[in-house]
Amino acid sequence: VSSVISSSLFEKMLLHRGFYTYDAFIAAAKSFPAFATTGSTDVRKREVAAFLAQTSHETTGGWPTAPDGPYELGSTSDYFGRGPIQISYNYNYGAAGKAIGVDLLRNPDLVTSDNTVEFKTALWFWMTPQSPKPSSHDVITGRWSPSSTDKAAGRVPGYGVLTNIIDGGVECGKGQESHVADRIGYYKDNLDCYNQKPFA
């Protein structure tokens, strides 16, 4: 992953990253060997740009007074949205914890107190199909082909389906939404950092 995104580029893309560090991102990515290593260099760069765009939206761009998005960082054991992709609900905490080897059901606050665990949960969500939806990784790397069910649900290849996977119930199918424009804006900004704009 470090061959696709340098520390200086990471810092440029995430100006208000606060708690989220390059070293934690790289350490977490090592647990998901297919992340940013699938396809051509352009595909790998698009994947990093898309991942960081989606996580930037989920954390409100990392504004300094909210390093983990719009949620209070209390020490509760509730399974509310935490981390760069805002995993929620006990079933996601359980599955993510099992995948990364950490008991997040008993220790959900690790998703706000350990920056490597935070990135691991986000990458777990990114790399794992969210049934009946595909993984974001398979979409952005071109490895996914929509089924007739996907097409009927409006899921077709492209950046938009990533939002459907991550937060479709809240943001999709409602016409023009500021949330959607925000996600697209981060993606375009990140692609500019890679000198890959405009993309077809």
Swiss-Prot record:
One of its GO terms (biological process) is cell wall macromolecule catabolic process. It comes from the Eukaryota. It catalyses: Random endo-hydrolysis of N-acetyl-beta-D-glucosaminide (1->4)-beta-linkages in chitin and chitodextrins. Keywords: Antimicrobial, Carbohydrate metabolism, Chitin degradation, Disulfide bond, Fungicide, Glycosidase, Hydrolase, Plant defense, Polysaccharide degradation. The active site is at E58 (proton donor). CDD domains: chitinase_GH19. The keyword Hydrolase applies. GO terms for molecular function: endochitinase activity. Its EC number is 3.2.1.14. The keyword Signal does not apply. Pfam families: Glyco_hydro_19. This protein functions as a defense against chitin-containing fungal pathogens. Belongs to the glycosyl hydrolase 19 family. Chitinase class I subfamily. This is Endochitinase.
